[in-house]
């Protein structure tokens, strides 16, 4: 290769490295273009969280569901239109997701200060972190620079979001597809320490587990009887809500893992964590461990999840309104 050719190659390599670097997530991505972006998100969260602590559970679920379909690109926020009536938001796993109006409020606050700068995907990620911190949970790094996706697909949501009735094989396959492992599965399931669930997400365990009117033997019988007599009175009940971690639904702590070991997790997916030796070992470790250790490891898994399939650089767009592509 001539000296000129070598020099040209080096220039192209350097340009490529710069482009690659610019296209990555980084801490403080908006420092120059919207210096108060993260403060604005945090302020809106703090203004609402005292009156609505359940917002934290809604946002972390939204973030989880968004990242598992086409990556963390805000596609869960897109409304149906005449040209696309089959969006993620309308898929059964997302019909009970909450927080859409709140994300719109944050977006409006940001647009008033820095129009067209901060992505809806970053808003979900930042607001989730800030809401968990606001209820006393862990914090974690949120590198920013995500861009918003233009595609939202009903079928992809059905195929990729881990279901509450999933067995261990189903769960670890879906997590593995996203680059997550057994430890991430157990840690992220720990978010069930906050929030509520509709009876319809687990009533088959109470009334018709194998199709013959039976009860799931992996669910503590006393707990199941209590649910049937006091909360979910029939398999047709799709409106009643039940705390996933009774008595502390707004407290981010280790009690979820202790409930799982007592066979009192609401979902089949909770019970599934005890069906695999590696997962069970992690559940036992957290159930008997320190909150500080759990918080640190949960934070690592949340940051890892927040990097799934992100769109950066010139990929995607910055939506003007989170519910519609530009």
Curated annotation (Swiss-Prot):
Species classification: Eukaryota, Viridiplantae, Streptophyta, Embryophyta, Tracheophyta
GO cellular component, one term: secretory vesicle
Binding site for substrate: 162
Native source organism of the sequence: Arabidopsis thaliana (Mouse-ear cress)
Miscellaneous section: There are 73 peroxidase genes in A.thaliana.
Transition state stabilizer, annotated site positions: 61
Source taxon at top rank: Eukaryota
Protein name: Peroxidase 39
First and last residue of the signal peptide: 1-23
Pfam families: peroxidase
PROSITE patterns, alphabetized: PEROXIDASE_1, PEROXIDASE_2, PEROXIDASE_4
Molecular function via GO: heme binding; lactoperoxidase activity; metal ion binding
Record localization: Secreted
């Amino acid at each position: 290769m001539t000296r000129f050719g070598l020099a040209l190659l080096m220039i192209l390599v350097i340009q490529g490295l710069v482009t690659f670097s610019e296209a990555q997530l980084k801490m403080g991505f908006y420092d120059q273009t919207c210096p108060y972006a993260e403060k604005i998100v945090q302020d809106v969260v703090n203004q609402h969280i005292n009156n609505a602590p359940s917002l934290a559970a809604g946002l972390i679920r939204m973030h989880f569901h968004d990242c598992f379909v086409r990556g963390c690109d805000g596609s869960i926020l897109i409304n149906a239109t005449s040209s696309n009536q089959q969006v993620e938001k309308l898929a059964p796993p997302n019909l009970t997701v909450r927080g859409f109006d709140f994300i719109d409020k944050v977006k409006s606050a940001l647009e008033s200060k820095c129009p067209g700068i901060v992505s809806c995907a970053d808003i979900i990620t930042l607001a989730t972190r800030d809401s968990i911190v606001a209820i006393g949970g862990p914090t974690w790094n949120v590198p920013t620079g995500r861009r918003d996706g233009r595609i939202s697909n009903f079928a992809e949501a059905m195929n990729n979001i881990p279901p509450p009735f999933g067995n261990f094989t189903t769960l670890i396959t879906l997590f593995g597809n996203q680059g997550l492992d057994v430890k991430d599965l157990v840690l992220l399931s720990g978010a069930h320490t906050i929030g509520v669930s509709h009876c319809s997400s687990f009533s088959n365990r109470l009334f018709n587990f194998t199709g013959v009117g039976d009860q799931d033997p992996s669910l503590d019988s006393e707990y199941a009887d209590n649910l049937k007599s006091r909360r979910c009175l029939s398999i047709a009940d799709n409106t009643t809500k039940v705390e996933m971690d009774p008595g502390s639904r707004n407290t981010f702590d280790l009690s979820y893992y202790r409930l799982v070991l007592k066979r009192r997790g609401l979902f089949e997916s909770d019970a599934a964590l005890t069906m695999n030796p590696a997962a069970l070992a992690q559940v036992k470790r957290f159930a008997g461990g320190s909150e500080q250790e759990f918080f640190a490891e949960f934070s690592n898994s949340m940051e890892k999840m927040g990097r799934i399939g992100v769109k950066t650089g010139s990929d995607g767009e910055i939506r003007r309104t989170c519910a519609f592509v530009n």
